[in-house]
Amino acid sequence: MNYRRNICLRIGWMLLFAFIPAYAGHSAEEWKRRSIYQIITDRFSLEEGATERIPCDPVRFMYCGGTWNGIRNHLDYIQGMGFDAIWISPIFENVEGNDIDGSSYHGYWTTNLYELNHHFGTKEEFMELIQELHKRDIWILLDVAINSMAINGPLEQMSFEKVIPFNDASFFHPHCWVDYESNDIESVQNCWLGDENLLLADVDTENEVVLSVLEKWIKNVVQEYDIDGIRFDAIKHAPIEFWLRMSKAADIFTIGEYFTGSPAEACDYQNSGLDSFLNFPLYWPITWAFNNTGLQCEALAIAINQINEECNDINVLGTFIGNHDLPRISHNNTDQARIMNAITFVMMWDGIPIIYYGTEQNFNSYHDPFNREALWLSNFDMENVYYKLIGILNRFRKSVQRQEENYVNTRSTILSVKIHHIVVQKLNVITVLNNYGIHNEERLSIVFKPLGASPKDTFFDIINNQKYVVNTDGTLKVVITNGFPIVLYPTSKIETSLPQFTATLLPEITFVPSITVTTHYVLPTLLAPLGYDIREHPGGQQFWNTLTAKSEAKTIRSFTKLKLFILLIAVPFALPMIILI
């Protein structure tokens, strides 16, 4: 009797687990179909019942009270934009206290790898968040900072005693400060970050004891918390061999942060075996293309071609226009149409789209710490035009994936590019982007030849609710209105499979002047963008050097011709004046 009972129980448990989805880990190929919403836990949402207007000044570098429960309570808000993955800031115990460098609300000053950060909640509450995410088919990308451990300074008084599990100096490289000026690889990978007040001791990633401990640790984290993917922080500061071992131990999708404007440098990590990296080499060209910088869309096309040449698989790279370290897209760009074009590029271009929290609310702050605002101060506005735009593009992207099996593995083709526009096609999806701006009242037309289209084929613009017919010569002419982006898909596919796109986004847009408040929360704006010199920004000089080196590039030729033209006009007038003097 007991034997039969045990057999029945075993069969019962087997049947039960057969119907429970396995969420612990997903491959790079699976992640290509996802889109990611990046969150800083402390700044996303307060506990239920907390005062929603609680002050949070990013400049103070203090904990503001966001928790894992807060995230769980606002998953409807995230799903309303169509996201099916979130990237959350590091979860492990950080140094305590508030010194001149502030507090560790961001999670990157790890001091104990075996305990969670109590400021964000308990282990049970974190597990409840994971369970609710997976119940909704939302994956979690966990941010991990393991190349260094945080120790309170000053240097002469520091102690490894509270650093867990590496509580001895033998587990770290000898102290030296990273030399940012020399770009020496030995310094970058073996010296320390931080400062005299907060030291980020550089873990000896060549030490086999350290490697063994971290391999077991990361494997356990993935299994214990049902993690779907991992984001490695600051991969530039450790050898590629270290990250490959960590990635193999995790046995799930991994994406690294390599802060560089060079496609060759970044792609080398992927080509060596790492699944993916955040596409910094494309970030700056995207920003400049849809801003007032003078480089515009032709420079973006050059960057695209460079990355295509250097990388093995661009469709798994993380595409973004902002994060917790960089200025928000609205900081130097207050033109609503251009911002919409930048967002559309991220959502429709090759790779995994990543949207930093607050982008959907048009937060307009500068870099760290200003760009780490409290989202609750926006009241989680689901009527904002950018919130709606992201939702439409996310749902459209999902619908296309269901219809076109190889969509996520197909590279986009540039059909047309000029200084003010770029047209790309990915299977049957055609994206027309421009930087004319919302003030351009002229109805501008762009003509291009879609791949695989026949005369009289019709395309539907899901953003502007317009239909276009292919001409007898195989070309398609679209009209740019107020500088808004255009996303086209065959009308037959829209009508049969995408009925939700029969309504347009634009009639719902209310254009109102920007209102800047202390939280950096602003409404959509009609103002022109602010210009800035790209060479003043990290990675900007690298890209500028690469771009200017390509003398055959059309953009550079155009600038050269303009300069020659000015000289030819100016010199004849200037010479008589010089002679008279």
Swiss-Prot record:
Keyword Magnesium: no
Binding of substrate, residues: 109, 231, 236-237, 261, 325, 372
Enzyme Commission no: 3.2.1.1
Binding site for Ca(2+) 2: 233, 257
Propeptide regions on this chain: 552-581
Signal peptide positions (record): 1-24
Molecular function via GO: alpha-amylase activity; calcium ion binding
Compartment annotation: Cell membrane
Disulphide-bonded residues: 56-64, 176-191, 267-311
Source organism phylogeny: Eukaryota, Fungi, Dikarya, Ascomycota, Taphrinomycotina
Binding site for Ca(2+) 1: 147, 202, 237
Record-annotated site: Transition state stabilizer: 325
PANTHER family cross-referenced by the UniProt entry: ALPHA-AMYLASE 2, ALPHA-AMYLASE FAMILY MEMBER
The protein's name: Alpha-amylase 2
EC main group: hydrolase
Entry superkingdom: Eukaryota
GO biological process: carbohydrate catabolic process
Short name of one Pfam family: Alpha-amylase
Protein keywords: Calcium, Carbohydrate metabolism, Cell membrane, Disulfide bond, Glycoprotein, Glycosidase, GPI-anchor, Hydrolase, Lipoprotein, Membrane, Metal-binding, Signal
